[in-house]
Every structure is written in C-alpha cells, then in structure tokens.
Amino acid sequence: MPLDSIQHAAQEQFQKQSHRYAKGHILENTSDLAAVLDGLPIPADAKALDIATGAGHAAFHLARAGYKVTASDLTPAMLLRVREGAAERGLNVETREHSAEALPYEDGTFQLVTCRVAPHHFSSPASFVRESARVLAPGGWFVVIDGTVTDDFPEAEAWLHEVEKLRDPSHNRLMPPKEWRAMCEASGLTVAKLNIDYRKQPDLEWYFQAANTSPINRAAVRSLIATVSDSIRQEYRLAEEEGKIVWWWPTLALAAQKPVL
C-alpha cells in the first residue's frame, strides 16, 4: 500500500536517524513497558507484535520475557538495527516492514500487540487501534505507551504540538487520554489500565539532537519557550537547571483487552 505524506515523512526521518536509537538511547530503559504489562494474564508462549518498533527495545523486552515476537516498522534502517540488536543479545525476533495503519496479518494472530512512543507519528491513530484490535485473538491485550496531553487544555496541546512539529517534522499529534479511550472502545477493546506519568526531559539540546533539528527550528522552539504563558509553563514545569532548559513530559500507558468470545 502506498505511503501517505505523514507516513513518508516518518519513514524519511527515521531512515536518517536510526543510528541514534540503537544504543545509549533513553528508550533502552523499558521499565515503563514492564510496569504496564505487570499483572496482565498473558500466556507464557504468547505471540506478540511490536508495532513501530524503532530500534527494537520493546521487542527485546518481550523476547526476553519468552514471547514469540514480531517487530514491525515502516523504516528499513530501523529493522536492520533490530536484527543487529537481537543478534547481539541472543534473542529470536522476527522483523516485518509495514505501516501501523494496515497490518498484513490474519484476524486473531496475536495474544499481545504493543506500541511504545510512536503513535504521535501515525497518520491515522484510529486505524492503528482498529487494526491492532483485529489482529488480536479474543482475550488478547493491546498495550500503548506514548506522550500525551491533558484532556480539555487546548492551549497547552497547541503549544506542545508546535514545539514538537518544529523539533521533528514527522510528528503528527499527541492525543489526550479521552481520545485513546474512545478509540479503544470504538474498536471493541475494554480499557483495563490507563495511567499518566510525568517524565523529566532533562536537556533541550539532547531533545534537538535526537531529531537532528535544524538551527532555524531550534531558535523557533527557544522563542516559544521564552514567551510561553504562565499556565503552560506550570503545566509542563518548564524551568532552567544548571543552565539547561528542562520540562516534564506527560506520558500515557494504556492496556486494553479484546473480549473473550
């Protein structure tokens, strides 16, 4: 299926930046995934699909847990990093190249579908949720971790969207919790966990480097930070520490189950 403009932008961005995600990246710490999976009744030999896997850190976590893992991504360079990383770790991870919105699997193929810190790049999050629900077996689990925005605070949402789009043009949208819940329910999934945590973004310069942000866009982001309203500054706890601009990023962790027939 041909890529749309948003998918093409994401593929182009991560094709160029794949080397930044393989080692020493913040996403190597998968304690967030472990927390949301904790207590879910997932079979020990479950077939798991990790969508938009990036460098494969979530997929490696699932493989270490004993699941039969397929790691998928839109970007060939990322999938190469996954294969290299799996080999280095002695893990068995299958890779597949495809978008998040059209999954090339039969209905009910997997007991677990995960997606970590990626849906804000998707052209159609609703299609992603619907397709994830389709490929889940009855009783299977859909698990998502991604940045989010506070429900019913459009000013803060618009500001963060502008910052993110300048930082990384492949960004599409961070969605509030109520929209995630609505998409799950519309796809026949029952939300069992929905938690919001705030993570410290400790250095604006690292934030730029991770996306190879242009000098012009870096200056634009700094201007947005310098002129931000008090309400948004408080929402994201924007501050300066030891000469570095820091803020606290809201992150959503969700687990939803496909009903048992």
Task: Please name every model-derived segment.
Residues 49-102:
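Class I SAM-dependent methyltransferase SAM/SAH-binding core
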Residues 114:
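A conserved beta-strand element that flanks and buttresses the S-adenosyl-L-methionine
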Residues 126-141:
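A short glycine-rich, Lys/Arg-flanked "PGG" loop and its adjoining helix->strand segment in the class I
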